[in-house]
């Protein structure tokens, strides 16, 4: 077993002499940061920023503004509250089911996508959240039995102090 500063320096020198590729540059697959432009050099390309805009959304903009829930008479703050509550419910259920975070996030994405095509007025957000966490556990290869999912949601409903599901009043 070689130890000491000399063996470390020799190993570093050997690694740096082996690093140049056939083209003579030392970029290879190593990621380095440049100080002159403030970007990151990956391969031969310089990346300086990440831009997130609505242009890269997975849901078309025309489906974002009048959601089916709004068309059924639900106001925006109530819909936002139901979306937040549904995502919190999925997160809490995922923790109790000991699912990986990626499965919980997948369930939340499925929940949002469902309610961009269906109405909160016509579908129970609790049942949809239950279905989303069940489907997400299968998609992310961390399957849980449906009985376990039902039991966890029943437990969470009892913790919230509700004896029955939330039913929104029908408009009109």
UniProtKB/Swiss-Prot annotation:
Record key words, sorted: Cyclin, Nucleus, Transcription, Transcription regulation
Keyword Repressor: no
Superkingdom of this protein's organism: Eukaryota
GO annotations of cellular component type: cyclin-dependent protein kinase holoenzyme complex; nuclear speck
Gene3D superfamilies (alphabetical): Cyclin-like (1.10.472.10)
Places the protein is found: Nucleus speckle; Nucleus, Nucleoplasm
Molecular function terms from GO: cyclin-dependent protein serine/threonine kinase regulator activity
Region (Disordered): 1-36
Region: Cyclin-like, residue numbers: 88-168
Description of how the protein assembles with itself and partners: Interacts with POLR2A via its hyperphosphorylated C-terminal domain (CTD). Interacts with CDK11A, CDK11B, CDK12 and CDK13. May form a ternary complex with CDK11B and casein kinase II (CKII). Interacts with pre-mRNA-splicing factors, including at least SRSF1, SRSF2 and SRSF7/SLU7.
PANTHER family for the chain: CYCLIN
Domains: entry comment: Contains a RS region (arginine-serine dipeptide repeat) within the C-terminal domain which is the hallmark of the SR family of splicing factors. This region probably plays a role in protein-protein interactions.
Family: Belongs to the cyclin family. Cyclin L subfamily.
UniProt name for this protein: Cyclin-L1
Gene designation per UniProt: CCNL1
């Amino acid at each position: 077993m070689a130890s000491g500063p000399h063996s470390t320096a020799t190993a570093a020198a050997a690694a740096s002499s082996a690093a140049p590729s056939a083209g003579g540059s030392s970029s290879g697959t190593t990621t380095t940061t440049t100080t002159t432009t403030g970007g990151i050099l990956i391969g031969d390309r310089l990346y300086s920023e990440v831009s997130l805009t609505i242009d890269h959304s997975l849901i078309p903009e025309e489906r974002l503004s009048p959601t089916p829930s709004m068309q059924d008479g639900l106001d925006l703050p109530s819909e936002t509250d139901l979306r937040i509550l549904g995502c919190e419910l999925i997160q809490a259920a995922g923790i109790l089911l000991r699912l990986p975070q990626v499965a919980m996030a997948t369930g939340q994405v499925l929940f949002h996508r469902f309610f961009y095509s269906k109405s909160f007025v016509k579908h129970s957000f609790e049942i949809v959240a239950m279905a989303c966490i069940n489907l997400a556990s299968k998609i992310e290869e961390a399957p849980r039995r449906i009985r376990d999912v039902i039991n966890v949601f029943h437990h969470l409903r009892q913790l919230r102090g509700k004896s029955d599901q939330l039913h929104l009043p029908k408009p009109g």
